[in-house]
Amino acid sequence: MKVGGIEDRQLEALKRAALKACELSYSPYSHFRVGCSILTNNDVIFTGANVENASYSNCICAERSAMIQVLMAGHRSGWKCMVICGDSEDQCVSPCGVCRQFINEFVVKDFPIVMLNSTGSRSKVMTMGELLPMAFGPSHLN
């Protein structure tokens, strides 16, 4: 699978990182684990997993968990790719609406998002622009 300018070895490393992050999920309520990995412009991989809470509104998705790691390391832009996986063998897991809006804040429209099933045997690639067409973003506030 070719994804943007990402090398095959980088994409495989991203997939492995997302699958491993999924194992670190804290999801005692939904029992649906999600993992995410992000490749930065200097080829560093950051990961995150969903973390649930008894007060459901306090849960955080894997995508935002990973993005916070990236942002706290000082990488505000220029990310290369995101990979998401979750506990569905039949379907590739896509970002929820909140995560789509959050991701949109920091990436360009052609930013590739690779969605995997639980084993990584199925994949679908979409861009941020495809996942959130006509997105509301920072330019609307100028």
From Swiss-Prot:
GO terms for biological process: cytidine catabolic process; cytidine deamination; deoxycytidine catabolic process; pyrimidine-containing compound salvage. InterPro entries: APOBEC/CMP_deaminase_Zn-bd, CMP_dCMP_dom, Cyt/Deoxycyt_deaminase, Cyt_deam_tetra, Cytidine_deaminase-like. Its EC number is 3.5.4.5. Keywords: Hydrolase, Metal-binding, Zinc. Residues 9-139 form the CMP/dCMP-type deaminase domain. It holds the Pfam family dCMP_cyt_deam_1. It comes from the Eukaryota. The active site is at 63 (proton donor). Its cofactor is Zn(2+). GO terms for molecular function: cytidine deaminase activity; identical protein binding; zinc ion binding. Zn(2+) binds at residues 61, 96, 99. Substrate binds at residues 50-52. It catalyses: cytidine + H2O + H(+) = uridine + NH4(+); 2'-deoxycytidine + H2O + H(+) = 2'-deoxyuridine + NH4(+). GO terms for cellular component: cytoplasm; cytosol; nucleus. This enzyme scavenges exogenous and endogenous cytidine and 2'-deoxycytidine for UMP synthesis. Belongs to the cytidine and deoxycytidylate deaminase family. PANTHER family: CYTIDINE DEAMINASE. Homodimer. Present with 3120 molecules/cell in log phase SD medium. This is Cytidine deaminase.
